[in-house]
């Protein structure tokens, strides 16, 4: 079955091509830390031959607590992204939360991301579609894989079919997430075989029902990522930090930065193996 290819500059993203890594940090904590983390990702991915897009947020507008760190904001965030692009030659992905942010962000970064909590907000979708940028759509925790087709249709109606779909888990009762990997193929089916990627970091979130911030299960990141990549998808989305215990957002789910290379060696081996197989249709 022919898979749709979405191009991010010279990086081709498709379910039957070698996987693309969308990786970086949760939120821009400082210019220096962003440079350090990006440099490490670039070094490792170039060594392993993995296509790479740097990820970070300039504003975490959906933090649980009013007291939680949000980020440097739009203007400073774009300056940092521009420096990363100029210094390391990387592509960049970041999320937008308001329609007014879509165009100025698209002028700097290569992929703009529709956050899971906002994925059904039509005005935001339309503003993002108008930019013509590649779009990464996070599947909301409360939306079934099949319903993602409706979100894709909004983008197509807005004139943009350069869509990547990203699974980050589904609600499992209160304060917990699970990943239904059967949904990956469903999302392909309802989106004309658009690229599907897996956000393993946020799928590891859990929380204290009375807490002010999410907890996480980073000790299980390798097994969950390996399982997801074994289904045959276009990419992996992951966040890492040199000191997860002191990260300003989602540290409990972040991969320790010094584990990135051995982690990616395993992921690449699985992706290479799975994509060496002929497609097997068992529906008939």
Swiss-Prot record:
Protein name: 2-dehydro-3-deoxyphosphooctonate aldolase
InterPro entries: Aldolase_TIM (IPR013785), DAHP1/KDSA (IPR006218), KDO8P_synthase (IPR006269)
Top-level class of the enzyme under EC nomenclature: transferase
Keyword terms: Cytoplasm, Lipopolysaccharide biosynthesis, Transferase
GO MF terms held by the record: 3-deoxy-8-phosphooctulonate synthase activity
GO cellular component, one term: cytoplasm
Gene: kdsA
Reaction equation(s) it catalyzes: D-arabinose 5-phosphate + phosphoenolpyruvate + H2O = 3-deoxy-alpha-D-manno-2-octulosonate-8-phosphate + phosphate
The species this protein was found in: Enterobacter sp. (strain 638)
Database matches in Gene3D superfamilies: Aldolase class I
Biological process terms in GO annotation: keto-3-deoxy-D-manno-octulosonic acid biosynthetic process
Taxonomy, superkingdom: Bacteria
Compartments, record wording: Cytoplasm
Chief location category: cytoplasm
UniProt EC number: 2.5.1.55
Pathway per the UniProt entry: Carbohydrate biosynthesis; 3-deoxy-D-manno-octulosonate biosynthesis; 3-deoxy-D-manno-octulosonate from D-ribulose 5-phosphate: step 2/3; Bacterial outer membrane biogenesis; lipopolysaccharide biosynthesis
Family membership noted in the UniProt record: Belongs to the KdsA family.
């Amino acid at each position: 079955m022919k898979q749709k290819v979405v191009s991010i500059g010279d990086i081709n993203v498709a379910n039957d091509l070698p996987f693309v890594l969308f990786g970086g940090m949760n939120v821009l904590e400082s210019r220096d830390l962003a440079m350090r983390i990006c440099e490490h990702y670039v070094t490792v991915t170039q060594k392993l031959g993995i296509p790479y897009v740097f990820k970070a947020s300039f504003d975490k507008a959906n933090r649980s607590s009013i007291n939680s760190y949000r980020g440097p904001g739009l203007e400073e965030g774009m300056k940092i992204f521009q420096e990363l692009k100029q210094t390391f030659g990387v592509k960049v992905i970041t999320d937008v939360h308001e329609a007014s942010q879509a165009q100025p962000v698209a002028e700097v970064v290569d992929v703009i991301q529709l956050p899971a909590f906002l994925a059904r907000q039509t005005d935001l979708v339309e503003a993002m579609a108008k930019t013509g940028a590649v779009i990464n759509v996070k599947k909301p925790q409360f939306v079934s894989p099949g319903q993602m087709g409706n979100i894709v249709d909004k983008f197509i109606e807005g004139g943009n079919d350069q869509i990547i779909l990203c699974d980050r888990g589904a609600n499992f009762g209160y304060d917990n997430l699970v990943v239904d990997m059967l949904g990956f193929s469903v999302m392909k089916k309802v989106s004309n075989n658009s690229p599907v990627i897996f956000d393993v970091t946020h799928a590891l979130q859990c929380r204290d029902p009375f807490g002010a911030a999410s907890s996480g299960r980073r000790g299980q990141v390798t097994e969950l990522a390996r399982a997801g990549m074994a289904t045959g998808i276009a990419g992996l989305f992951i966040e890492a930090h040199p000191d997860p215990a002191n990260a300003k957002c989602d540290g409990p789910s972040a991969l320790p930065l010094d584990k990135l290379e051995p982690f990616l060696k395993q992921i690449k081996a699985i992706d290479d193996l799975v994509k060496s197989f002929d497609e097997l249709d068992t529906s008939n």
